[in-house]
């Protein structure tokens, strides 16, 4: 390991920029540094009167284990629209890892979030009607929200504070994907340090 790197898990309250940058945390701790990489979504994003589009891609995924070989690990399902939630744009995708296990994820594009039991009901319906199993074990759960917006996140960078991730505008507004941008922008950051 590198003795110059220390992992700290804190919730960041604020970042001030002067001669040395001070990152203050909810716990009351303060850290100083030359560069800050900030993935927080700025407060200005939550304003509703600025004219920017705000749709949320939100999802609940289960890694499931079934008792019979119902999945083909050589095939995945990207946008299955057979299970619908009310009058929304939604889909389910399935990423099998074996004939018995897969990530099954229900995703919606809406301005407002739905209740957790509604995601769960859609996943249960998909498992029953599309996979053919009501007897399955949930091994892992993931939940996420990705802003789908034309808000200019990246306009908030400074000489020494770099916005990264969603808060840095790395997410493609039309798809919610960020893998390629994360790779490209991370390389640029490393080259400029």
Locate each region found by the language model.
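Predominantly flavin-linked oxidoreductase catalytic cores and closely associated redox partners
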Residues: 2-136, 149-153
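Active-site segments that bind and position negatively charged phosphate/pyrophosphate groups
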Residues: 171-181
């Amino acid at each position: 390991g590198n003795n110059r790197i220390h992992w700290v898990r804190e919730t960041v309250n604020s970042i001030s920029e002067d001669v040395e940058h001070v990152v203050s945390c909810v716990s009351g701790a303060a850290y100083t540094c030359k560069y800050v990489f900030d993935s927080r979504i700025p407060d200005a994003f939550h304003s509703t009167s600025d004219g920017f589009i705000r749709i949320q891609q939100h999802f609940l995924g289960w890694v499931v284990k079934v008792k019979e070989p119902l999945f083909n690990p050589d095939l995945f399902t990207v946008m299955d629209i057979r299970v619908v939630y009310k009058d929304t744009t939604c889909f389910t995708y399935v990423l099998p890892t074996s004939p018995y296990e897969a990530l099954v994820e229900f995703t919606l594009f809406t301005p407002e979030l739905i209740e957790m039991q509604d995601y769960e009901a859609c996943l249960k319906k998909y498992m029953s009607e599309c996979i053919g199993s009501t007897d399955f074990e949930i091994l892992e759960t993931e939940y996420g929200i990705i802003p789908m917006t034309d808000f200019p996140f990246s306009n908030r960078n400074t000489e020494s504070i770099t916005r990264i991730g969603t808060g840095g505008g790395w997410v493609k507004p039309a798809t919610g994907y960020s893998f390629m941008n994360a790779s490209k922008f991370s390389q640029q950051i490393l080259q400029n340090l």
